[in-house]
Curated annotation (Swiss-Prot):
Residue ranges of the TM segments: 188-197, 204-213, 216-225, 310-319, 325-334, 407-415, 424-433, 479-488, 495-504, 584-592, 595-603, 624-633, 638-647, 676-685, 690-699, 734-743, 756-765, 791-799, 803-811, 846-855, 861-870, 906-915
Residue ranges annotated for the TBDR beta-barrel domain, each copy included: 187-915
Extent of motif TonB C-terminal box: 898-915
Name assigned to this protein: Transferrin-binding protein A
Renumbered residue ranges of the record's region Disordered: 523-542
Organism: Neisseria meningitidis serogroup B (strain ATCC BAA-335 / MC58)
Record's comment describing the protein's domains: The N-terminal periplasmic domain encodes a plug that inserts into the 22 beta-strand barrel, the extracellular loops extend up to 60 Angstroms away from the outer membrane. Part of the plug (the plug loop, resides 121-139) interacts with transferrin (TF), as does the L3 helix finger in extracellular loop 3 (residues 351-361). When the L3 helix finger inserts into TF it disturbs the conformation of TF and its coordination of iron 2.
Length: 915
């Protein structure tokens, strides 16, 4: 309905009408000087924002590829460097196990790429003894950041968007397309990036090629990386370190003489006994080496690491003439290797270890006796698997991990910029993804110092030893997804409706193989010398009557440790779990005029799993997730926000397989973990920038942990059945999050344009921890996953035309709260004992970083950064947490904590080229 505009004739109107002819005449007189100006069109690519999916944006962070470049993100640890409340979970062997958010980590924080879940952190039981706390890798595959267009980090329950795993938050990556490389108005694009990071001697080389011919287009990205371990502050590794090593010395006993028959040229005992040899015994000798070469629990430096990565991404496609329809494909292959040596394992035997093993083994024939002048050949003791190991060789423990990801898929995208049909946007995609983690443990005892990973026992190296153990874990997904978006108005209310559907066939497979040992022995016998003139000789080891022995070449013995069906770590029966899942989600973000925005979402998930192993806790799970949010806008400069959301995590494949204690376990019913998030915030915004402060409350229940069902018998609590993964814990946390960016020119226009400041703060407090009464032998939930409270303050300048810029960042972290590391364990007898996650916690620390960039002719950008500018000595909690009980591969028997020191002053450089 059109409104009628009434025209009222008055003195003012008459005056204007009278003046108009004269004005028109003047314009006509000057028309000869008029020029038609060209039409200027300004186009900008749509950037992902915090409020794209959820109206409040509370708890969300969005980073574009440009942001990643500016922050010099070269690996997973750089991604959240300046984002308090989000931390990387160290896997313990150079890799990572995802992120920790709001007290939860690993599989409780969802990780997806284009909606496809990445591999779970699968921790298998470890072999008894040794240094390992997990038999498998426990890592989560890392993402190639040069392939990333944008990343959205959500803190708080987020299953309505990301499904299972988003119990405490989610990290969602979006892959680049050809448009991200091809410049506006061009038909092709080339991007190259060369970067070096001093903290780990990391080198990155990436090149992206994209082109468009007619409707056809394609993108190709290749990235290679090579790096070492993250080096600690130089002060942590200064000096030298000493250790004891067992060396051979002559036995002082009067009855320790012998003759080797093979060394007696004429074979006559009587002739050769005039020059007998003396037995050897072990004695500790103090030796000194550099801190880099030292092995043992008191090692100052981190374990050496060799890291390599190769990634290919290929995205071909065809865009139809009207540009509404697009059909494309994606092929991705990424392989990363993490090869490390555990140098906390002493390379050399000591007298204490030698004597203890020898005592345990009893009498060892030939001990102390050697051939030739090779005195070390007489020092050997009992080792693993009944093998004898010599003091001559050093021990090396190596972990070689290879992470391989392969993905290919098809997609159809419909985009309607005119918004005049049933959908503004629709996407139908099919992805087939396989991710495998190959974890190979090797223990060598066949080289001089233990550093040779490739040495093997041989007949000419008696008492040498080798052990291999390999666990290969893989997951596969065949995922079909559909997404629809539509904006429309009803009664002056703007709706932004989206519908998401998905169906997945998945599989999990763990193979335990190459589990064997090899050892080299020697031929030895103690003989009776031939009679002398018919007289029997009985040697007693004295100088005049030495022993008469034979020492010959031995052989190599190989023994298999793998067993089938014994339900312990040595069981090498393949583990397989398969299943299907589907989901349906709907979300509507509504704009109620200029005063308020309201949003709500609902999602239904279904998962069914099965296995050939009857002990696996498979089954069917149905879950419903939702969220709701509101933004009140009383003024142009103030927003009041509030949101609630739920999250869930279905039992992981490792939890479904269960804990095997040598008996045939029974399958148990495991319910999904659940979470409920409440969050309220206030946002100040304007020409000055924006500042947001929020308070959150996260409650977790039915947390899954290993333990027993409890029962009361004769008035006492006792365990029922076998150990299993059970729903047993609940917890609640609260916290504060502050985020802001200030444009100083907007605050005061006298200041130059381009100056800005940033501020971020996060604090979490544990409010409640409970254990179910019908569970026992349960460890209370320890919040070692909480990052200590942290402030990040920045001051920067970007030249208005984007030619150059500089930025300084101050990061201050508080100490790790001791209360977050203390807990109790419910014992089988009904009592409990106090526990502690780890023996150490970190102190407060601060660092200053400075970075900048300079662009030459719009094609070349040089970036540089100085991190820990003041060369401050500090230790992060994320590093020390590797010694905590909740660590994936817990570091045990740590003597000194220098090895966890953060890098000192270090530099990063990169050169970007765009054409």
């Amino acid at each position: 309905m059109q409104q009628q505009h009434l025209f009222r004739f008055n003195i003012l109107c008459l005056s204007l009408m009278t003046a108009l002819p004269a004005y028109a005449e003047n314009v006509q007189a000057g028309q000869a000087q008029e020029k038609q100006l060209d039409t200027i069109q300004v186009k900008a690519k749509k950037q992902k924002t915090r409020r794209d999916n959820e109206v409040t944006g509370l708890g969300k962070l969005v980073k574009s590829s440009d942001t990643l470049s500016k922050e010099q993100v070269l690996n997973i640890r750089d991604l959240t460097r300046y984002d308090p409340g989000i931390a990387v979970v160290e896997q313990g062997r150079g890799a990572s196990s995802g992120y920790s958010i709001r007290g939860m980590d690993k599989n409780r924080v969802s990780l997806t790429v284009d909606g496809v879940s990445q591999i779970q952190s699968y921790t298998a039981q470890a072999a008894l003894g040794g240094t390992r706390t997990a038999g498998s890798s426990g890592a989560i595959n890392e993402i190639e950041y040069e392939n990333v267009k944008a990343v959205e980090i959500s803190k708080g329950s987020n299953s309505v968007e990301q499904g299972s795993g988003a119990l405490a938050g989610s990290v969602a990556f979006q892959t680049k397309t050809a448009d991200d490389v091809i410049g506006e108005g061009r038909q092709w694009g080339i991007q190259s990036k060369t970067a070096y990071s001093g903290k780990n001697r990391g080198l990155t080389q990436s090149i992206a090629l994209a082109g468009r011919i007619g409707g056809a287009e394609a993108l190709l990205i290749h990235t290679g990386r090579r790096a070492g371990e993250i080096r600690a502050h130089e002060d942590a590794g200064r000096g030298v370190q000493s250790f004891n090593r067992l060396v051979p010395v002559e036995d002082s006993s009067n009855y320790a003489y012998f003759i080797v028959k093979e060394e007696c040229k004429n074979g006559s005992y009587e002739t050769c006994k005039a020059n007998p040899k003396k037995d050897v015994v072990g004695k500790d000798e103090r030796q000194t080496v550099s801190t880099r070469d030292y092995t043992g629990p008191n090692r100052f430096l981190a374990d050496p690491l060799s890291y390599e990565s190769r990634s290919w991404l290929f995205r071909p496609g065809f865009r139809f003439e009207n540009k509404r329809h697009y059909i494309g494909g994606i092929l991705e292959h990424t392989q990363q290797t993490f090869d490390t040596r555990d140098m906390t394992v002493p390379a050399f035997l000591t007298k204490a270890v030698f004597d203890a093993n020898k005592k345990q083994a009893g009498s060892l024939p030939g001990n102390g006796k050697y051939a030739g002048n090779h005195k070390y050949g007489g020092l050997f003791t009992n080792g693993e698997n009944g093998a004898l190991v010599g003091a001559e060789y050093g021990t090396g423990v190596f972990y070689d991990e290879t992470h391989t990801k392969s993905r290919y898929g098809l997609e159809y995208v419909y985009t309607n910029a005119d918004k005049d049909t049933w959908a503004d946007y629709a996407r139908l995609s099919y992805d087939r993804q396989g991710i495998g983690l190959d974890n190979h443990f090797q223990q060598t005892h066949c080289s001089a110092d233990g550093s040779d990973k490739y040495c093997r026992p041989s007949a000419d190296k008696p008492f040498s030893y080798y052990k291999s153990d390999r666990v290969i874990y893989g997951e596969s997904h065949r995922l079909l997804q559909a997404a629809f978006k539509k904006s429309f108005d009803t009664a002056k209310i703007r709706h932004n409706l989206s519908v998401n559907l998905g169906f997945d066939r998945f599989g999990s497979n763990l193979r335990h193989q190459d589990y064997y040992y090899q050892h080299a022995n020697r031929a030895y016998s103690s003989n009776t010398p031939p009679q002398n003139n018919g007289k029997k000789i009985s040697p007693n080891g004295s100088e005049t009557s030495p022993y008469w022995v034979t020492i010959g070449r031995g052989n190599v013995v190989t023994g298999q440790i793998c067993r089938l069906g014994n339900n312990t770590y040595t069981d090498c029966t393949p583990r397989s779990i398969n299943g299907k899942s589907y989901y349906a989600a709907v979300r509507d973000n509504v704009r109620l005029g200029r005063w308020a925005d309201v949003g709500a979402g609902l999602r239904y998930d279904y998962r069914s799993t099965h296995s050939d192993d009857g002990s696996v806790s498979t089954g069917t799970h149905r879950t419903l997730s939702w969220n709701a949010g509101i933004v009140l806008k009383p003024t142009d400069w103030l927003d009041l926000t509030y949101r609630t959301s739920t999250g869930f995590r279905l039992p992981s494949f490792a939890e479904m397989y269960g804990w095997r204690a040598g008996v045939q376990s029974k399958a148990v019913k495991i319910d999904p973990e659940k979470s409920f998030n409440k969050e309220a915030g206030i946002v100040f915004k304007g020409d000055f920038g924006n500042l947001e402060a929020s308070w959150f409350n996260n409650a977790y229940r039915d947390l899954i942990v290993r333990g027993y069902e409890a029962q009361i018998k004769d008035g006492k609590e006792e365990a029922k059945g076998d150990p299993a993964y059970l729903n047993a814990q609940s917890a609640r946390i609260t916290g504060i999050n502050i985020l802001g960016k200030i444009d100083w020119n907007g605050v005061w226009d006298k200041l130059p344009e381009g100056w800005y400041s940033t501020f971020a703060y996060n604090r979490v407090r544990v409010r409640d921890i409970k254990k179910r009464a019908d569970r026992t032998d349960i460890q209370s939930h320890l919040f070692d996953a909480i990052q200590p409270s942290r402030y990040v303050v920045g001051l920067g300048y970007d030249q208005p035309e984007g030619k150059w810029g500089v930025n300084g960042m101050l990061t201050y972290s508080k100490a790790k709260e001791i209360t977050e590391l203390l807990g109790s364990r419910a014992l089988l007898n009904g009592n409990s004992r106090n526990t502690k996650a780890t023996a150490r916690r970190t102190r407060p620390w601060y660092i200053v970083d400075v970075s900048g960039y300079y662009t030459v002719k719009k094609h070349f950008t040089l970036r540089a950064g100085v991190y820990n500018l003041l060369n401050y000595r500090y230790v992060t909690w994320e590093n020390v947490r590797q010694t905590a009980g909740g660590a994936v591969n817990q570091h045990k028997n740590v003597g000194v904590y220098n090895r966890y020191a953060a890098p000192g002053r270090n530099y990063t450089f990169s050169l970007e080229m765009k054409f």
